[in-house]
């Protein structure tokens, strides 16, 4: 079966578009009236890790836009208006001659054979050692970059996923028998009624200081969850009884509140059991293909990664507008999909193509203990794509452990304009002390970058008490689950897999036992403190960057409950129903 290519983060899809547009120009020059050629099964890369899946019910989702001529030809530069380079939108008042564009991949674009792609993904040349992951997840962790995610946006860090197991106690047998008996596929009866609009944010949810202390007493079920979380810390037997009752009021096939509650019950059980339930089938009976398709489905349904990469790339593009040599240090690269759109923008900028573009890639933790093969495959894909754009491009894998990195590892040349990218990766270094994050930031500062881009999840789950962490996580993930409903129906198997394999695992990491394996995140105020204490000052995002982020939400027909909020000193936040989800900023 062939899947329609609908993802502008997909290098193969962009390559098809690039070649098709070049051919259109040649046909126009020759005044040819032959029908536009379509490229079927084109794959200029030796390994294509970016899948496309069947389109969701909304035809405008993913990276495709409706209409064959939605945007101008990215290879046709107009006069220099003096405006910042950026995405060129045909429906904006001012055109920008060089920058990012939304190509149309929903029209008569290329198709490719999904079986052939799956073989190359699962049996390709970038396998890594992820022995500290559950065995069923090994292949997935080696190929976890989708759409324009730098890595799994809801990935549980490999170093934090598993907990050593001791022989099961009587308490854990009770919990396992009472709470973890998942219904078989035959027992699941999805609701047939259409999904309802997510309820508005409760009136009495408040934010106190920088730690987002949230009151969730408006809903009896949410209140019961908070009370159960209190019991988990002191009265375990009562907590177990409470969890048994809560299990009756939640469902992985219900409304967003019921579904998020289902995974919070599981997370609380893991905490009560002190890691002894890690072998439950919900956490290990998965295949790499299931993970792969889940990431693709999430990226098609929600704008998380599109927003983060679009905004960061725009800041880099503006900071390097007239640079002839550009060097990007990418902390936490997986498969480099973020850079496809940037390379295309640099190839068409009004100031002309750069003389050289170089990316130094520091592997993300998700690549495991031996990331060399994955980085090599990433570099080869980007090199092949740069050749299509006629760009002089270099990729340098950085295999030095992050704690040992110094300025000499990057060979920064005096005539290079340097950009440093931290995209949904620094949170992996968070701990009870900020030492690891500060070390990475100060090392980046020593490189004297022109611009530093930072993208992080907007929720405080680090140095706060367990109850506050629980409340913050409940509010955050309730919003995430609600955001899936407009484009994923209640009976959608894609939605079930996204929540079970991606979000449920992350919730478990947040609520589970404390220690180095626990998932940690911080809000923008804490990131501001960390950035400023490391010597960085904020750089305001341009009006154009903010405008194009708004147009991104509009053009892809996402729910009107998505919103953008710009706040001091220079943050741009994507929110769902007024609950912040992701924040992007730039620094120098």
From Swiss-Prot:
Q: Where in the cell is it found?
A: Nucleus
According to the record, the residues making up region (SAW) are 512-588
DNA-binding recorded as keyword: yes
User: What InterPro entries does UniProt report for this protein, alphabetically?
Assistant: TF_GRAS (IPR005202)
Q: What is its main location?
A: nucleus
Looking at the record, which segments are called Leucine repeat II (LRII)? 377-408
Q: Which residues form the GRAS domain?
A: 212-588
Q: What induces it?
A: Up-regulated by drought and high salt stresses, and down-regulated by gibberellic acid (GA) treatment, but not by plant hormone abscisic acid (ABA) application in leaves. Under the salt treatment, expression is induced quickly, and it peaks at 3 hours. Under the drought treatment, the expression is not induced immediately, but reaches its maximum at 3 hours. Under the GA treatment, the expression becomes weaker within 5 hours.
Compositional bias annotation for Pro residues:
192-201
Q: Where is this region: Disordered?
A: 23-46, 75-95, 181-204
GO MF annotations, alphabetized: DNA binding
Which controlled-vocabulary keywords does the entry list?
DNA-binding, Nucleus, Stress response, Transcription, Transcription regulation
Would you indicate the residue range of the signal peptide?
A: none
Pfam families noted in UniProt: GRAS
Composition bias (Low complexity) maps to 23-38
Segment PFYRE: which positions? 418-509
So where does this one cross the membrane?
none
Superkingdom of this entry's organism? Answer: Eukaryota
Subunit: Homodimer.
Could you tell me what this protein does? Probable transcription factor involved in plant development. Involved in environmental abiotic stress resistance. May increase the expression of stress-responsive genes. Binds DNA in vitro.
* Name recorded for this polypeptide: SCARECROW-LIKE protein 7
Q: Which organism is it from?
A: Populus euphratica
């Amino acid at each position: 079966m062939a899947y329609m290519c609908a993802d502008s983060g997909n290098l193969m899809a962009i390559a098809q578009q690039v070649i098709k547009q070049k051919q259109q120009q040649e046909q126009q020059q020759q005044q040819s009236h032959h029908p536009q050629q379509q490229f079927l099964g084109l794959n200029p890369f030796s390994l294509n890790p970016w899948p496309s899946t069947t389109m969701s019910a909304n035809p405008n989702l993913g990276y495709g836009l409706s209409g064959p001529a939605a945007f101008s030809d990215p290879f046709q530069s107009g006069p220099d208006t003096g405006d910042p380079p950026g995405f060129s939108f045909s429906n904006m008042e001012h055109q920008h001659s060089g920058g990012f564009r939304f190509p149309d991949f929903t029209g008569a674009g290329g198709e490719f054979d999904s079986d052939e792609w799956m073989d190359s993904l699962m049996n390709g040349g970038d396998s890594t050692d992820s022995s500290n992951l559950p065995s069923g997840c090994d292949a997935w962790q080696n190929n976890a970059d989708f759409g324009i995610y730098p890595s799994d946006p809801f990935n549980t860090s490999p170093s934090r996923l598993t907990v050593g197991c001791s022989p099961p106690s009587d308490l854990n047998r009770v919990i396992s028998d009472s709470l973890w008996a998942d219904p078989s596929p035959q027992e699941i009866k999805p609701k047939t009624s259409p999904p309802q609009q997510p309820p508005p944010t409760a009136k009495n949810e408040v934010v106190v200081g920088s730690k987002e202390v949230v009151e969730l007493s408006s809903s009896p079920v949410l209140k019961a969850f908070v009370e159960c979380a209190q019991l988990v810390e002191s009265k375990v037997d009562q907590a177990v009884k409470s969890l048994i009752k809560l299990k009756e009021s939640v469902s992985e096939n219900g409304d967003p509140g019921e579904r998020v509650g289902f995974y919070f019950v599981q997370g609380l059980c893991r905490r009560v059991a002190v890691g002894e339930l890690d072998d439950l089938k919900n956490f290990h009976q998965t295949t790499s293909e299931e993970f792969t398709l889940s990431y693709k489905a999430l990226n098609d349904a929600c704008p998380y990664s599109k927003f983060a990469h679009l905004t960061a790339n725009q800041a880099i593009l503006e900071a390097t507008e007239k640079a002839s040599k550009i060097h990007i240090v990418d902390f936490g690269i997986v498969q480099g999909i973020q850079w496809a759109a940037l390379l295309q923008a640099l190839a068409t900028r009004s100031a002309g193509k750069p003389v050289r573009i170089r990316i130094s890639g520091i592997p993300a933790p998700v690549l495991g203990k031996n990331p060399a093969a994955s980085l090599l495959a990433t570099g080869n894909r980007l090199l092949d794509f740069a050749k299509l754009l006629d760009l002089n491009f270099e990729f340098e894998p950085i295999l030095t452990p992050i704690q040992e990195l110094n300025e000499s590892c990057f060979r920064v040349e005096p005539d290079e304009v340097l950009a440093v990218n931290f995209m949904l990766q620094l949170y992996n270094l968070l701990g009870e002390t900020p030492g690891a994050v500060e070390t990475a930031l100060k090392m980046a500062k020593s490189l004297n970058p022109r611009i530093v881009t930072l993208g992080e999840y907007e929720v405080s789950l680090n140095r706060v008490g367990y109850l506050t962490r629980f409340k913050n996580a409940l509010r955050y993930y309730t919003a995430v689950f609600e955001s899936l409903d407009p484009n994923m129906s209640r009976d959608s198997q894609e939605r079930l897999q996204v929540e079970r394999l991606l979000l449920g695992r992350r919730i478990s990491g947040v609520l589970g036992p404390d220690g180095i394996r626990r998932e940690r995140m911080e809000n923008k105020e804490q990131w501001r403190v960390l950035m400023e204490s490391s010597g960085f000052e904020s750089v305001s995002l341009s009006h154009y960057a903010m405008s194009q982020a708004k147009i991104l939400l509009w053009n892809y027909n996402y729910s009107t409950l998505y919103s953008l909020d710009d706040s001091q000193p220079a943050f741009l936040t994507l929110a769902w129903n007024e609950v912040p989800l992701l924040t992007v900023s730039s620094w120098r």
